[in-house]
Curated annotation (Swiss-Prot):
PANTHER family: LARGE RIBOSOMAL SUBUNIT PROTEIN BL17M, RIBOSOMAL PROTEIN L17. NCBIfam families: L17. This is Large ribosomal subunit protein bL17. GO terms for biological process: translation. It comes from Acinetobacter baylyi (strain ATCC 33305 / BD413 / ADP1). Gene3D superfamilies: Ribosomal protein L17. It comes from the Bacteria. One of its GO terms (cellular component) is cytosolic large ribosomal subunit. InterPro entries: Ribosomal_bL17, Ribosomal_bL17_CS, Ribosomal_bL17_sf. Belongs to the bacterial ribosomal protein bL17 family. Part of the 50S ribosomal subunit. Contacts protein L32.
Amino acid sequence: MRHRNSGVKLGRTSSHRKAMFQNLANSLFEHELIKTTVPKAKELRRVAEPLITLAKNDTVANRRLAFARTRSAATVGKLFTVLGPRYKERNGGYLRVLKAGFRAGDAAPMAYVELVDREVNTSAE
């Protein structure tokens, strides 16, 4: 029986999964838009959204928890100085997953993961 077993394995060991989602979350918080496969994007929400919720309350304990989960001082700094205040009034739903077709090599379904309410650079002007 698989009762209470949530999360997808994605064909990886638990340590590989943990490292992969840590790296994906760090990239997402740094760039605010990343492209990945749809299953990874959907699972990334379960990792990244609680970190933003944590960043809404800036305490030393919360900063230490965020660092324990990301292992990146730059990410923690951005979470608590930029992203936490940005989403102070929003109750969840900080990420948007947009389908982006299929990858050329193996036809894997791809998706963009972006932070809602991010500043979009319009450098085409």
